[in-house]
């Protein structure tokens, strides 16, 4: 029996161990998509206790605590931090097979030097150990980032954001990790929502362009894209129910936009036409600006209405949406391709059943650069051992896995960089099994190049960041 989470955790073959320990383990971290707060990086926040850093905004953990019958008081309510930590600790032993069990223990080992395991009985010991460690100068937000080997972070930012914290970080020569904005214009696209008109008023104010029709909306968006680009942005992200394709004339889209600006009801057909036009417009701009377009789709959000009213979005009440017409995605990419306006694109589906369709679709639109159209890393509900293996295996079956840009945290926590380690171990185990089974030769030069590439170097080249590859 192997020891729990030893140095060869998740590595079962000699080749897997060689690939991980010689090539993947020491690679830096490029976190090209996350939800951390740049203000906390600039201000170099120091956390008072482990609950603040672990449970403050982690809806993955909240969801499992609720599943374990924990009262909301000890999840997001007014329970004390110590009580919330106890509730989480008592939940942990039941999470066998869940990536949270692995991630949490990796974080305890890497950042706090704790080699035991967390449960209700050890909670006091872990609480005291972690809280004492958090008072050390190396355990501030910047310290955690630096000791994690991070070279660059892309946050997630709205077009109306000032980007002041990114600017302050860039001007601070005491911190050499790049923290760049990423453009997330969902609020400008959600014409069917009651928040649309007030948001467009904000966009008008920030851009200095009064948005009254489709032409002025495009001008305002271009204005803000240029502002983001001037502040280092070269990455966008979109959260879609699915990748739709409902083409319409400019006149139709203009009329729909004007209805939205008046707060009038928008039909489903009108919503899809507006969103299609919006996505086609911004995608063409991304191609001109050499930005990468990320699309996350397949999520049905905020399913528990009264808790959404109480807590807001991203609080643990989302699920997989199994409606994703792949033909429309292909049609959307085809229109961009037909005019030479297809940007580098990364597609992520929350539904694991979409792996094969994505892998097959992206093969239709490649060109210019290696892996121009990517299948994104296993995301959210798929961000576990089996999900990662299935995503990479399907991409290998139907595409060119060696060009894959690899892992991202997609996290709100500064301890989540261990997810890159988790991913790399699974990657090396997968490659190792293929070599051990005689399905790929023990060509160490090729294997080293691919492992280093998927761990870090491919993303450096793909996104065009000002970073050096690691050989």
Question: What label would you give each PLM region?
Answer:
Residues 2-289, 341-343, 347-352, 356-359, ...:
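Metal-cofactor-binding active-site regions of metalloenzymes
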Residues 308-316:
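Short glycine/proline- and charge-enriched loop/turn segments
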Residues 332-338:
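Short, basic/hydrophobic alpha-helical segments
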Residues 304:
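Hard-cation-handling environments
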């Amino acid at each position: 029996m192997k020891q729990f989470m030893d140095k060869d955790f998740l590595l079962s073959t000699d080749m897997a161990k060689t690939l991980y320990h010689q090539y993947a383990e020491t690679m830096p971290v490029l976190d090209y998509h996350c939800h951390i707060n740049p203000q906390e990086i600039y201000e170099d926040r120091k956390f008072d206790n482990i609950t603040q850093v672990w449970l403050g905004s982690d809806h993955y953990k909240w969801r499992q605590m609720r599943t374990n019958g924990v009262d909301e008081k000890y999840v997001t309510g007014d329970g004390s931090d110590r009580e919330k930590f106890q509730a989480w600790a008592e939940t942990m032993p039941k999470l066998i097979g869940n990536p949270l069990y692995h991630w949490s223990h990796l974080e305890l080992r890497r950042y706090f030097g704790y080699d035991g395991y967390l449960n209700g009985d050890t909670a006091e010991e872990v609480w005291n150990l972690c809280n004492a460690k958090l008072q050390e100068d190396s355990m501030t937000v910047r310290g955690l980032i630096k000791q994690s080997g991070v070279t660059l972070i892309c946050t997630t930012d709205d077009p109306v954001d000032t980007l002041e914290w990114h600017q302050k970080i860039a001007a601070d020569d005491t911190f050499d990790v790049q923290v760049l904005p990423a453009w997330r214009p969902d609020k400008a696209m959600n014409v069917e929502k009651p928040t649309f008109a007030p948001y467009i008023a904000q966009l008008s104010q920030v851009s200095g362009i009064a948005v009254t029709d489709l032409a002025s909306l495009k001008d305002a968006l271009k204005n803000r894209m240029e502002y983001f680009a001037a502040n280092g942005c070269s990455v966008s992200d979109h959260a879609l129910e699915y990748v739709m394709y409902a083409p319409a004339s400019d006149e139709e889209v203009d009329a729909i936009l004007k209805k939205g600006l008046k707060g009038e009801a928008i039909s489903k057909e009108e919503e899809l036409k507006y969103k299609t036009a919006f996505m086609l417009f911004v995608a063409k701009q991304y191609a001109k600006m050499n930005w990468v377009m990320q699309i996350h789709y397949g999520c049905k959000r905020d399913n528990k209405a009264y808790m959404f009213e109480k807590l807001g979005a991203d609080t643990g009440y989302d699920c997989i949406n199994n409606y994703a017409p792949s033909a429309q995605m292909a049609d959307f990419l085809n229109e961009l391709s037909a005019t030479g306006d297809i940007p580098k694109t990364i597609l992520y589906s929350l539904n694991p059943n979409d792996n094969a369709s994505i892998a097959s679709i992206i093969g239709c639109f490649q060109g210019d650069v290696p892996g121009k159209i990517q299948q994104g890393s296993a995301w959210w509900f798929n961000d576990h051992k089996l999900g990662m293996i299935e995503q990479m295996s399907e991409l290998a079956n139907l595409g060119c896995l060696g060009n894959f840009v690899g892992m991202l945290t997609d996290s709100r926590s500064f301890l989540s960089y261990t997810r890159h380690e988790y991913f790399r171990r699974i990657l090396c185990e997968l490659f190792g099994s293929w070599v051990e089974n005689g399905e790929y030769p023990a060509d160490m030069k090729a294997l080293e190049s691919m492992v280093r590439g998927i761990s870090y170097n491919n993303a450096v080249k793909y996104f065009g960041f000002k970073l050096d590859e690691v050989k």
